[in-house]
Amino acid sequence: YEIPLRLVGSEMCIRDRQKTEGKLHVTQVYLGEFLFKNLELDFENGRITAYSCTNFDSEDENHKYIEDNILFHHKTLPMGEFAIGTNTTAYRMARKYQIADKLPILIAEKTGPHFAVGDTCYTYDEDNMTYNPDGKAIIARDNEISIRRKEDISKAYFNCHTDITIPYDELGAITVVRADGTTTDIIRNGRFVVPGTEPLNEPLDAMEP
């Protein structure tokens, strides 16, 4: 893997989402203009199996809020993407000036690590070759759901893609686990630790407690 510091973008992955298991919890996050408090999404086999938040006193209202603004009335959604946004300067500015709800989604998603539920970012474009800025082809454009378009396109897409960004101060670690069991940390205690990524931490270290 490589995290190019010259880019205010993100490093992303969409493969093997059937193996996604666990709970996604964020104490507070804006999804567009909608604020979610204590958002929790449970995943089994790469799909949402339970969900909750604490915006309202009523559990039914909280469920409806998620169904209206994340699930978009699907019974469940798959994991569409995991990416690590590297624009820590934008993250700091959003926190300092309390403008997280004003950021366009293509900026907000690049401020930190995020999961997306729904379709991948290559929806309806999987068959077109896509390249990184360094000229290398992006080959992981499909997954077990989007590939269904070759037989029945109605089973391949959900027509939604919602990015949920995790604040750095809520991160323990993001770690690569290889097939042989060896590991490499990318983020540890809310800071980038891959050699060469130290400049990404400067805006984070400059934030007021």
What are these regions (language model features)?
Residues 50-122, 126:
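Dual-mode signal for accessory low-complexity, basic/Gly-rich regions
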Residues 92-209:
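Charged, compositionally biased interaction regions
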Residues 1-9, 13-14:
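Single conserved hydrophobic/aromatic residue that forms the stacking wall/gate
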Residues 30-32, 47, 88, 121, ...:
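Residues that cap or initiate secondary-structure elements
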Residues 17-73:
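Long, well-ordered mid-to-C-terminal structural blocks that present hydrophobic/aromatic surfaces
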Residues 19-21, 36-38, 45, 77-81, ...:
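Active-site lining segments that contact anionic ligands and/or coordinate catalytic metals
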